[in-house]
């Protein structure tokens, strides 16, 4: 045993339906010496393996550990092993040994209010149970669910690891853009492209009886329905006319009407002017004739 290698035991309680997932995760992380038991009473925790001179009891249990290890190596997805000899009261060992891993490797453990750790503390050194059980209620947030069981004391963040789906897509120019349906820095909520049925019904209830919503009502719709002002106004414009908005003006029609009015007002004056010019011309002609005859 190398003096630089440190070993610890981990007692983990997981649901029966998550045994396969948990075992696959442990093997993928390099933990090979793993055994499953039905209850903590079947566990025989040997002495601290970090001691230079292991006791005789640890040597006597070593054969069962190697047997469990070979069984887990040959059949990784095998069901929990049970004792075949009914006379033996200590059939298996629940342990997790680190092989070729740094000292800061994470060890999954479970939060539990079970008094079993207190019963084991009489026969097991206290340092082996450190950080394995929470004996006092903590104000820290609950650990996240990991493959069906609670994991505390994890040294790495799975959300930033291979389990996290990256929403950024390369555009071919060496830069990245955000997925159109994923959250981004400008809008944390996913992009909504279509109104839902309850949102339509809520707006219809507000604008019933041809009531156009006020500014306060529009702001209330924005908050409760989580819609933009543009989406709301477009939905209302298809069903109601905004009374506060002036009707649209056709400038071509307006110019034509103005021209017609101008023409209708200018016709009588033009006729009078033309008649006066004709009379004056006749007077000039008559005067010129009288002068020539005289």
Curated annotation (Swiss-Prot):
CDD domains according to UniProt: homeodomain
Predominant localisation class: nucleus
A single cellular component GO annotation: nucleus
InterPro entries according to UniProt: HD
Superkingdom in the source lineage: Eukaryota
Keywords: Activator, DNA-binding, Nucleus, Repressor, Transcription, Transcription regulation
An example Gene Ontology biological process: negative regulation of transcription by RNA polymerase II
Effect of deleting the gene: RNAi-mediated knockdown leads to misexpression of markers of the asymmetric state of AWC neurons.
Residue ranges of the annotated DNA-binding region, renumbered to this chain: 192-232
Polar residues bias: start-end ranges: 52-63, 81-115
The keyword Nucleus belongs to this UniProt entry's keyword annotation: yes
Keyword 4Fe-4S: no
Location relative to the cell: Nucleus
Region (Disordered): 43-119, 167-191, 238-274
Compositionally biased spans, kind Basic and acidic residues: 250-265
Alphabetized GO MF terms: sequence-specific DNA binding
Tissue expression: Expressed widely, including gut, the amphid sheath glial cells, and head and tail neurons including AWC, ASE, and ASH. Expressed in AWC (ON) olfactory neuron but not AWC (OFF).
Record's function text: Transcriptional regulator which binds DNA consensus sequence 5'-CCTTAAC-3'. Plays a role in establishing and maintaining asymmetric cell fates in chemosensory AWC neurons during larval neuronal development. This is achieved by repressing the expression of multiple AWC (OFF) genes, including srsx-3 and hlh-11 in the AWC (ON) neuron. Activates expression of sox-2 in the AWC (ON) neuron.
Stated name of the protein: Transcription factor nsy-7
Taxonomic path: Eukaryota, Metazoa, Ecdysozoa, Nematoda, Chromadorea
């Amino acid at each position: 045993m190398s003096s630089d290698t440190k070993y610890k035991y981990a007692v983990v309680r997981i649901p029966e339906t998550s045994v396969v997932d948990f075992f696959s995760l442990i093997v993928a992380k390099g933990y090979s010496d793993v055994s499953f038991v039905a209850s903590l009473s079947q566990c025989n925790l040997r002495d601290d393996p970090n001691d230079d001179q292991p006791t005789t009891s640890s040597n006597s249990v070593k054969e069962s550990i190697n047997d469990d290890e070979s069984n887990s190596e040959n059949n990784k997805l095998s069901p929990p092993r049970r004792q075949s000899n009914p006379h033996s009261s200590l059939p298996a060992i629940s342990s997790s040994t680190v092989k070729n891993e740094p000292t800061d490797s994470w060890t999954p453990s479970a939060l539990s209010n079970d008094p079993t750790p207190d019963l084991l503390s009489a026969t097991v050194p206290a340092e082996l149970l450190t950080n394995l059980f929470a004996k006092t209620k903590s104000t820290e947030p609950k650990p996240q669910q990991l493959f069906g069981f609670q994991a505390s004391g994890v040294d790495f963040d799975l959300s930033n690891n291979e389990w996290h789906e990256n929403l950024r897509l390369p555009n071919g120019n060496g830069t990245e853009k955000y997925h159109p349906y994923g959250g981004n820095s400008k809008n944390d909520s996913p992009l909504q492209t279509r109104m839902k049925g309850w949102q339509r019904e809520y707006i219809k209830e507000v604008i019933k009886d041809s009531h156009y919503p006020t500014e306060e009502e529009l702001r209330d719709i924005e908050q409760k329905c989580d819609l933009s002002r543009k989406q709301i106004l477009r939905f209302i414009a298809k069903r109601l006319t905004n009374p506060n908005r002036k009707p649209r003006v056709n400038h071509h029609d307006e110019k034509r009407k103005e021209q017609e009015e101008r023409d209708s007002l200018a016709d009588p004056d033009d006729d009078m002017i033309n008649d006066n010019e004709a009379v004056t011309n006749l007077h000039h002609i008559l005067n010129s004739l009288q002068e020539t005859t005289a």
